[in-house]
Amino acid sequence: MMFKQYLQVTKPGIIFGNLISVIGGFLLASKGSIDYPLFIYTLVGVSLVVASGCVFNNYIDRDIDRKMERTKNRVLVKGLISPGVSLVYATLLGIAGFMLLWFGANPLACWLGVMGFVVYVGVYSLYMKRHSVYGTLIGSLSGAAPPVIGYCAVTGDFDSGAAILLAIFSLWQMPHSYAIAIFRFKDYQAANIPVLPVVKGISVAKNHITLYIIAFAVATLMLTLGGYAGYKYLVVAAAVSVWWLGMALRGYKVEDDKVWARKLFGFSIIAITALSIMMSVDFMVPNSQNLLTYVW
C-alpha cells in the first residue's frame, strides 16, 4: 500500500509522457545507431529527475491542492506521506537522477536536467504559478527539457536540432496547458492561480491558443527543413498541426467551452505522441541534403 502512495506522489502519468518525448529526442539524434546502455541511463535518469520535481511540486502545492477538486485527494493533501518524508524522498530521487545523467550520459544532459528542474521547482512552482499569468510560459521551458536531454545525451552538443526540439515542445505546452485551465477553470479560480483564462478571460486564451498552435506548426516543420527528420515525419507534423489548428478555430463558435477544451487537450496528447514516434523512426542520416540547402 505504501508503495502505491510513493508511486502516486511522483505523478507517473507525467513521467510516462515525458519518457515518450525523451525517446523521440534520443532516437532522432541516434539516427539508427542506438547505444542501448546510454539509452537506459538516459531514460532512467530523466525519469528520476522528473519524479523528484513532481514530488517537490506536490510538497509546494499542498495548500492550493486542497482547494482544487482535481487535486484534493493527492497523497500529501490526505497526509498519507508526511511533508518531511516527501522532501527526503524527492531529494534522493533527484540525486540519483542527476548522477545517472552525469555519469551514464554526459555532463550536458545532466546540466539540462538541472536547468529544467530549477525552472520547474524553483521558478514555476515556488513563485510564478502563484503570482504571474506568465507562469505557464515559464513552466513550458521545463516541460520541453526531456526531449532535449534525450537528444543531447547522444550528441553531447546543443546544436540547432536541440534548439528546434526546445521550440517545438515549449510551444506545444502552451495550448495544451491553456486547454486544461479552461476545462478546470473553477479549480484554478478557487485556488487563486493566475492562469490566462482566469485572469484575461477564455476569449483571450482562445486567441493565444490559436497563435501558439500556428507557431508550433512552423517549429515542427523545421526538423525536416533543417535536415534532421524525413518527409514522412513532415507529412504527419503538417497533418496534426492543421487538424489541431482547425480544432482551435472551431473553439470560437462552440457553446460549451469545457467540452471543446477537453477535446483540444486530448488531441494535444495525440499530436505530441505522433511527432515523438515519427521523429524516432523517420530521421535524416548524416550528410543528407536538407531543404534549407536549396533555399540558400
UniProtKB/Swiss-Prot annotation:
GO BP terms: namely: heme O biosynthetic process
- What are the disulphide bonds in this sequence? none
Pathway as given in its UniProt record:
Porphyrin-containing compound metabolism; heme O biosynthesis; heme O from protoheme: step 1/1
Instruction: Name the major location.
Output: membrane
Which residue stretches are annotated as topological domain Cytoplasmic?
1-9, 57-78, 127-197, 248-268
The yes or no answer to whether the keyword Membrane is present is: yes
Q: Which reaction does it catalyse?
A: heme b + (2E,6E)-farnesyl diphosphate + H2O = Fe(II)-heme o + diphosphate
Q: How does it sit in the membrane?
A: Multi-pass membrane protein
Annotated TM spans: 10-28, 38-56, 79-97, 108-126, 198-216, 229-247, 269-287
What keywords is this UniProt entry annotated with? Answer: Cell inner membrane, Cell membrane, Heme biosynthesis, Membrane, Transferase, Transmembrane, Transmembrane helix
Q: Spell out the InterPro entries in the cross-references.
A: Protohaem_IX_farnesylTrfase (IPR006369), UbiA_prenyltransferase (IPR000537), UbiA_prenylTrfase_CS (IPR030470), UbiA_sf (IPR044878)
Q: Which GO terms describe its cellular component?
A: plasma membrane
Q: Give the family this protein belongs to, as stated in its UniProt record.
A: Belongs to the UbiA prenyltransferase family. Protoheme IX farnesyltransferase subfamily.
Protein known as: Protoheme IX farnesyltransferase
Q: Which organism is it from?
A: Salmonella typhimurium (strain LT2 / SGSC1412 / ATCC 700720)
Question: Which taxonomic lineage is given here?
Answer: Bacteria, Pseudomonadati, Pseudomonadota, Gammaproteobacteria, Enterobacterales
